[in-house]
């Protein structure tokens, strides 16, 4: 797989608010090339929305590989939280990207910059490596 998607990236994609490079990046990860955490599914589907938006979100998520809360992910998330104050969902998403050895595509780069070994890609950047 190419990269790991943060919840905010998926939400921006759903709303069509990513610039063209970000839209192309996310689209390039469809059908087995990118992954997201089960936490992102909870974050994206777990709020009040129209049936149309919910269906669009479910359809989008089905294009990527969902990763679960495996022991290595949980252990890595615990390690991250023991080193610095970080929200549980962010710790799980970062841990998932680390365990699966994928760059994390997120606009919240400031939340993750301190994590050694985690490559970050901002989907709202004008150019994406």
Predicted features along the sequence, with ranges:
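Alpha-helix capping/helix-boundary segments
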Residues: 9-10, 40, 73, 92-93, ...
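Nucleotide phosphate-binding site architecture
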Residues: 10-11, 45, 113, 121
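Short, conserved catalytic or interaction motifs in soluble domains
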Residues: 15-16, 66, 117
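Short, well-structured N-terminal submotif of metal-dependent ribonuclease cores
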Residues: 1-36, 46-62, 127-129
